[in-house]
From Swiss-Prot:
Residues the entry annotates as binding ATP: 83, 101-105, 490
Family to which the UniProt record says this protein belongs: Belongs to the SecA family.
Region of interest: Disordered: 856-940
NCBIfam families attached to this UniProt entry: PRK12904.1, secA
A GO BP annotation: protein transport by the Sec complex
Protein name as catalogued: Protein translocase subunit SecA 1
Enzyme class, broadest EC rank: translocase
The enzyme's E.C. designation: 7.4.2.8
Pfam family, one: SecA_SW
PROSITE patterns according to UniProt: SECA_MOTOR_DEAD
Gene3D superfamilies: Helical scaffold and wing domains of SecA (1.10.3060.10), P-loop containing nucleotide triphosphate hydrolases (3.40.50.300), SecA, preprotein cross-linking domain (3.90.1440.10)
Keywords: ATP-binding, Cell membrane, Cytoplasm, Membrane, Nucleotide-binding, Protein transport, Translocase, Translocation, Transport
Amino acid sequence: MLSKLLRLGEGRMLKRLKRVADYVNTLSDEVEKLTDAELRAKTDEFKKRHADGESLDDLLPEAFAVAREAAWRVLDQRPFDVQVMGAAALHFGNVAEMKTGEGKTLTSVLPAYLNGIGGKGVHVVTVNDYLAKRDSEWMGRVHRFLGLDVGVILAQMTPDERRVAYNADITYGTNNEFGFDYLRDNMAHSLDDLVQRGHNFAIVDEVDSILIDEARTPLIISGPADGASNWYLEFARLAPLMEKDVHYEVDLRKRTVGVHELGVEFVEDQLGIDNLYEAANSPLVSYLNNALKAKELFHRDKDYIVRDGEVLIVDEFTGRVLYGRRYNEGMHQAIEAKEHVEIKAENQTLATITLQNYFRLYDKLSGMTGTAQTEAAELHEIYKLGVVPIPTNKPMIRTDQSDLIYKTEEAKYIAVVDDVVERYQKGQPVLIGTTSVERSEYLSRQFQKRRIPHNVLNAKYHEQEAGIVAVAGRRGGVTVATHMAGRGTDIVLGGNVDFLTDQRLRERGLDPVETPDEYEAAWHEELPKVKAEAAAEAKEVIEAGGLYVLGTERHESRRIDNQLRGRSGRQGDPGESRFYLSLGDELMRRFNGAALEAMLNRLNLPDDVPIEAKMVTRAIKSAQTQVEQQNFEVRKNVLKYDEVMNQQRKVIYAERRRILEGENLKEQALEMVRDVVTAYVNGATAEGYAEDWDLDALWTALKTLYPVGIDYATLTRRDADGGFDDLTREELLEALLKDAERAYATREAELEEIAGEGAMRQLERNVLLNVIDRKWREHLYEMDYLKEGIGLRAMAQRDPLVEYQREGYDMFMAMLDGMKEESVGFLFNVTVEAVPAPQVAPVQTPEGLAELGAPAEQGGTATAARDEAPTQLRAKGIDNEAPAMTYSGPSEDGSAQVQRNGGDAKTPAGVPAGASRRERRAAARQQGRGAKPPKSVKRR
């Protein structure tokens, strides 16, 4: 119902976009007459008009006409009217649903150019580094032709290179890099370390993949914790010895494991411990669960691969390797132990944000995808984004065949290979979609046996992705690929002309960034030749039936299936698609597989005879809908809990930024001193009369905070009975506040003698930043610990979310109080020394980056500007080096979790590992006390 309501305004929006495209068309003749220099000068004209008060909406028709003409002159590609409509939808802050092959990348050039004129920056977000680099070079040619700077953010870049890229008018990069840079900026200790300059406008390519599929994936920057435990190896040894459905059970749908009583007894006997669930042994439960999950739920060459002794996660939606990403909650270490590779240290969360909350930082957000209607409700509810389906440039004539279902996987793959061989023999290109690296390599071996030339595209061959996809539409091409979702290169019948042309030019040593002039000249010379060759081959492919897409398994998301199908039939080309299924497929096993198997058994069909039935289609659709609803609920739940952290994060990050930007912090520091002293006094004088106050304890506490300069005896008068006379709490507080302010002034004078004027301001900044960071890290740990167990509140008929909000708020306020107290203590008591300021070396910027956005007069060298400081303060215990950081990914359910350390288990002294439970209990009773932890656990 919500989806229907959201689509009510589609007709009006399409009419509005059509009027925009028509208006842009009326300007075409005028723009075509302009010389290259005059076309480029339009950018300066638009910037001036915008600065004089003209809105970007007012400039839209002219700017789009100029960008459209520039694309034609530079790329030999003129955006169609439907692409202009899509571009307008993006500018107005919508998701443009454009089918595969309709030119989404070219469409993004127009709104990026228009919003780049505003000078506040445009972020074009892609799904991987390759596409970010490719688009910044390819589409960047248009922007540079028109006089705009273009930058690209890549994983290996230094902070100085990133700063140059962010200062460009248009910046390309991945969602992870943008998000991690935001987190790093909010961990910086100097303005010079900041790289981003705000969140103005984002265009998200494959928006459903990034904002929906990866929304369960919080971005986490972690630092090393206390160290890894040998328990991972011990439980990796035990897990294979335990039997499924005897020692434990597995729920594939929820992706959980549950240990039976027999399993608990088995582990206790193996480890030589008395009770797995007593407090001292409770960390072992997590090791056990992770070892069983690694055994049953995480499969090599599907969920991860092992390369060069390292476990690398494979994205379940795109099939790409997620370099640098690790499972949390000890899951990655459990998999490393299972695969017998080096177990890397566990991590502590330093900073985290969900992609949902990161992208909601942008003033304006838009996106492109070929499949958004199925997620329109979620995009509207979470991001306030409308979905506008853009008409195709030519009618779609692809034939989508009904699914074929086989009883066994073996029979299914035999049929797949036979079908592909038949298509290959008549010259029809085939794209086979698989769900795992293992399956793609199995099919590859079958094709080798049948001597069918083919390409394999999976996580192991990620680097060759663009080249493989670009030639997948050539005559007789056979391509085996895992999860075609998000593959940014078009499959064009006869071959991708742009890619093939670029490939030939690069073979000649030409590059669009390094040698732009020679590249442009050679491009226009080579392009017609490649076009002619590709057109002749495309004609043969069309006669053979166009691209045939063959899916070997249904994905849990209908969108992924639709994206795979959408690779065929682009721009009015003929094409065909079909899915081959079996009862052994994961989706069928998780949902409704038993009913289908019973039906096939009743029909008594041979294994190699498939069925086509509406029941199959309904069962698959029902299963996919259930999974999508589950995933939506998970994402909504993640967002609800992260919203609590998000409000707290905003407060902390705003405070850090204020400190970094150089505001005089003296008054804030003095206010902290007053607050802490007041809290101490209130605590000591809360109850009773003056004679009941424990001023000795108060003075002892205050002396640990700052050098108290007065004795309370001088503030009081004793009466005949020895009690205090006429001393009020207000008088006591006033005297102590004056004394604390005096002590602060004395401290400031001492520091200025050591390091000159402004030394106290420098110490205030260092102390506040370090205390904020340390307390925030501790708070993240505590909040994750709270979230981990908050679900149990439901057993007491309490709403876990409400409890999390309430306790999270109390913990946050307690953290702020602790922050004040710790800061005041450091300001008064930390030992400092003056050291020479470090010399600033010029930062060398690669020539390519200078082209992509560095000012011309820099000549390829950028020098970070810093205030001159002859000396700096070094505070012991404060100016510590930042810990080594890692950038980790999701746990298996996508929720944000922190890895924590466990302790060692306890065993009764003198009882060998492997003794029976009765023997261990008897030994414990004889000792009459708790057991001591052994130095190690012996194996049987």
